[in-house]
């Protein structure tokens, strides 16, 4: 009986640790502002993007706009980082985003303000959470 209890306890601990280590897709865009455009222009487009995202309903997509503070390789005016809870969610939400003209219109609006030369998808595994 003790062996069974130890096994169940170990399985619960393993399952808990395993679920905490799930990977999540995170995209990064490296962008430079177009001639004559500013971060204020970008934030105006971000406001429109947020409104569009709200019309799509529930979403697991979290987005971050990052500007350089210091470093040697500061080649972009800003980075856009966005993450989903899973690859399945990424696919479903990308389909929803481009499922009507709104997604293409948002891409065009971003393109008027900035040129994003780099787009990467990384898998992120939390190693410490607050």
Region locations from a protein language model:
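Sec-dependent signal peptide recognition
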Residues: 2-10
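Hydrophobic h-region of N-terminal signal peptides that target proteins for export
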Residues: 10-18
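Non-heme di-metal
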Residues: 102-107
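Short S/T/G/P-rich N-terminal loop/turn motif that feeds into the first structured element of a domain
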Residues: 17-101, 112-130
């Amino acid at each position: 009986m003790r062996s069974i209890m130890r096994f169940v306890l170990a399985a619960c601990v393993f399952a808990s640790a395993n679920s905490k280590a799930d990977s999540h897709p995170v995209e990064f865009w490296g962008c430079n502002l177009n001639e004559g455009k500013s971060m204020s222009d970008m934030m105006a487009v971000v406001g429109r993007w947020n409104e569009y995202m709200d019309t799509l309903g529930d979403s697991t997509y979290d987005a971050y706009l990052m500007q350089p503070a210091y470093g040697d390789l500061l080649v972009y005016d800003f980075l856009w980082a966005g993450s989903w809870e899973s690859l399945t969610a990424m696919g479903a939400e990308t389909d929803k985003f481009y499922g009507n003209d709104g997604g293409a219109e948002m891409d065009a609006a971003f393109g008027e303000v900035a040129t994003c030369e780099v787009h990467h998808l990384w898998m992120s595994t939390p190693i410490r959470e607050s």
